UniProtKB/Swiss-Prot annotation:
Binding sites annotated in the UniProt record for L-glutamine: 354, 382-385, 405, 462
GO cellular component assignments: cytosol
Annotated binding of CTP, by residue: 13, 148-150, 188-193, 224
GO molecular function: ATP binding; CTP synthase activity; glutaminase activity; identical protein binding; metal ion binding
Similarity-based family: Belongs to the CTP synthase family.
Organism: Prochlorococcus marinus (strain SARG / CCMP1375 / SS120)
Further comment: CTPSs have evolved a hybrid strategy for distinguishing between UTP and CTP. The overlapping regions of the product feedback inhibitory and substrate sites recognize a common feature in both compounds, the triphosphate moiety. To differentiate isosteric substrate and product pyrimidine rings, an additional pocket far from the expected kinase/ligase catalytic site, specifically recognizes the cytosine and ribose portions of the product inhibitor.
Protein name as catalogued: CTP synthase
Gene: pyrG
Active-site residues (renumbered): 381, 507, 509
Keyword Secreted (UniProt): no
Entry EC no(s): 6.3.4.2
Sites where the protein binds Mg(2+): 71, 141
Length: 551
């Protein structure tokens, strides 16, 4: 039977519950336990798919096509375990399910209420993850902050969960803040005390406190927190600010988080194997020369909008012994200021995904700059579509070329709507989503990077390359290096005349892992290193890991 761990947060939002949950998952996995992690988000949206990146950050896409919270990306990267749509639960999806059941008459005329119907639905979602994953331990992160009205049904549900399983099958972790007051020179415990008091008033006594702080927490302070909060002193776990999120598992291991959780759950504390993770952190802290990568996007005011892209670049730099320096470039600024003022001195350019007209011409201009200046370039989703438009306009002679997303009446729609999207009206959850196969063309850079005939990548798009123009592109020098197995959909393109110019319709960033960088990102960084002084190496001379088999 599975064991269950619940992670709540107090005092402030964005306190790091997701990283704590992901780090615990890594620590448990390093001891031989299988884990699955889910997120309970207390907003009324059914999923974050239609939410603004400025409000929510990136939308992370799972293998089975769910549009989810970016924390699921952390879960996957830390545990190297694929999550599913079951691992993402929102208040909106809970209410939608309960209301649908009521409309079908499933409640036999009963009065449908938050308690017991909503809380029961929440508990059933957690049990469903357990049944589907067969994991030894299910970790559940509850979004929001204890004390928020919108989180109450979730907190009540995890309180009730004690009745579903044995007391030794469940553990509660509360992540809280210990602020330092400069004027008094003291770390204050009162916010933590009040947060635990609030949690207790709901009926939940935390078993472990993970205390965020920017400085060391001494034994005396831990004893004080233990006394006021009813938690064993050994279960007061300091979580100091870290130089990298990937060093957090090592810090929490040192402080004994995993040991305490296993003790509460009455599980054996096996030998911990973090040798590869420790080597990764050593490499991260001792990088080689810096590589400057420009990320040209629409949402650059909020870096979390491109979180997986940043992490994929970081993974590639770790593997290539490089220090990552990201230059955030607004696509709209390129339209007004020109690429020569914003992209000079850049070692590589990434144009990530997005939607709508705003900033598209700036992206196209940046791609032209990368092509003409022979700067390593990687386009993702909309980035590939912009690369296609740039080539059509400037090389293939189609000056009016564009996407039908940008101009429904375009004379040359080199990018057009997927046929199956023609009659779609709703925006949420209706795109081409999830994992699809891509057949790679032999003797192309893409094939060489992957080292596979067929790869599987995650998608999130409505528009595609228009095959009416395929012959024109190939004849003018474009190389189509990856398609759907039936050859109908163009998935990966490249320019053989360029040091590194490739773009894909999918989102490779979702599959990159700290110890297994995605081949396209690693290839980009390796190509960028050739532009650095005193870096005598050939592009792709290193044998890239067999990415898909190790996935």
């Amino acid at each position: 039977m599975a064991k269950f761990v619940f992670v709540t947060g107090g005092v402030v939002s964005s306190i790091g519950k997701g990283i704590v949950a992901a780090s615990l998952g890594r620590l448990l996995k390093s001891r031989g336990y299988s884990v699955s992690i889910l997120k309970l988000d207390p907003y009324l949206n059914v999923d974050p798919g239609t939410m603004s990146p400025f409000q929510h950050g990136e939308v992370f896409v799972t293998e089975d096509g769910a549009e989810t919270d970016l924390d699921l990306g952390h879960y996957e990267r830390f545990t190297d375990t694929a999550m599913s749509r079951l691992n993402s639960v929102t208040t909106g999806s809970i209410y939608q399910s309960v209301i649908n059941k009521e409309r079908r008459g499933d409640y036999n005329g009963g009065t449908v209420q938050v308690i017991p119907h909503i809380t029961k639905e929440i508990r059933e979602r957690i049990h469903r993850v357990s049944a589907n994953s067969n994991a030894d331990i299910i970790i559940t992160e509850i979004g929001g902050t204890v004390g928020d009205i919108e989180s109450l049904p979730f907190l009540e549900a995890i309180r009730e969960f004690k009745g579903d399983v044995g007391r030794n099958d469940i553990a509660y972790i509360h992540v809280t803040l210990l602020p330092f007051i400069n004027t008094s020179g003291e770390i204050k415990t009162k916010p933590t005390q009040h947060s635990v008091k609030e949690l207790r008033s709901i009926g939940i006594q935390p078993d472990v406190l993970v205390c965020r702080s920017d400085r060391n927490i001494n034994k005396e302070l831990k004893t004080k927190i233990s006394g006021f909060c009813g938690v064993h002193a050994e279960a007061v776990i300091p979580a100091l600010d870290a130089d990298s999120i990937y060093s957090v598992p090592l810090s929490l291991k040192k402080e004994g988080l995993c040991r305490e959780i296993l003790k509460i759950l009455e599980l054996e504390d096996h030998q911990c194997d973090l040798e590869e993770w420790e080597a990764l952190i050593h490499q991260l802290r001792n990088p080689g020369p810096s590589v400057t990568v420009a990320v040209v996007g629409k949402y650059v005011r909020l870096n979390d909008a491109y979180l997986s892209v940043v992490e994929a670049l970081r993974h590639a730099c770790i593997a290539q012994n490089a220090s990552l320096n990201i230059t955030w470039v607004s696509a709209e600024k390129i339209e007004t200021e020109g690429p020569e003022n914003l992209l000079e001195g850049i070692d590589a350019i990434v144009v990530p995904g997005g939607f709508g007209n705003r900033g598209v011409n700036g992206k196209i201009t940046a791609i032209q700059w990368a092509r003409e200046k022979r700067i390593p370039f990687l386009g993702l989703c909309l980035g590939m579509q912009c690369a296609v438009i740039e080539w059509a306009r400037n090389i293939a002679g189609l000056k009016e070329a564009t996407s039908s997303e940008l101009d429904p009446n375009a004379s040359h729609p080199v990018i057009h709507l997927l046929p199956e999207q023609q009659d779609v009206i709703d925006l949420g959850g209706t795109m081409r989503l999830g994992v699809y196969p891509c057949r790679l063309t032999p003797e192309t850079m893409g094939h060489k990077l992957y080292g596979e005939e067929v790869v599987y990548e995650r998608h999130r798009h409505r528009y595609e390359f228009n095959n009416s123009y395929r012959n024109l592109f190939v004849e003018s020098g474009y190389s189509i290096s990856g398609t759907s197995p039936d050859g109908r959909l163009v998935e990966l393109i490249e320019l053989k005349s360029h040091p590194f110019f490739t773009a894909c319709q999918y989102h490779p960033e979702f599959l990159s892992r700290p110890g297994k960088p995605h081949p396209l990102f690693q290839g980009l960084i390796e190509a960028a290193q050739l532009r650095l002084p005193a870096t005598p190496q050939e592009v792709f001379k290193n044998t890239l890991p067999n990415f898909q088999k190790n996935k």
